[in-house]
Amino acid sequence: MEHNILQVIALAEKLKYEMRHSWLSNGRQESVAEHTWRMSLMAILVEPYLDQKVSIEKLLKMVIIHDLVEAEAGDIPAFDTMNSHELQLQKQKNELEAILNIKQTLTGSLGEELYDLWMEFEAKKTYEAKVANALDKLEV
């Protein structure tokens, strides 16, 4: 395909078996894909109650791609990076390399859009990014 979309779809499949540091109510470990799905549902459900108007399309895109880098970089739990500055820097480096690879794979405006959304999520400056980050913390 023109933008190597199938490569990114194949990469995203890894999120189905990339396990997170959290467990479901039935005791089974959660995958990154399950985490992302539930965050997406939460975004739809809370959007009407937010203090400010958001672009639900942008919010959902941000939620969906925020952990795409973990398909390549793996999931390093936040509580591991809290006590290790070195591990925090390694996580940032790995994830930045991963999003740059995704951007390069997709090329053009689609690659730019995913890169920009991921960077916006990481910066936590816009209202959508703040909401997405809050949902990420709530969905553990």
Predicted regions: what is each one?
Residues 1-140:
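Alpha-helical, largely C-terminal catalytic domains
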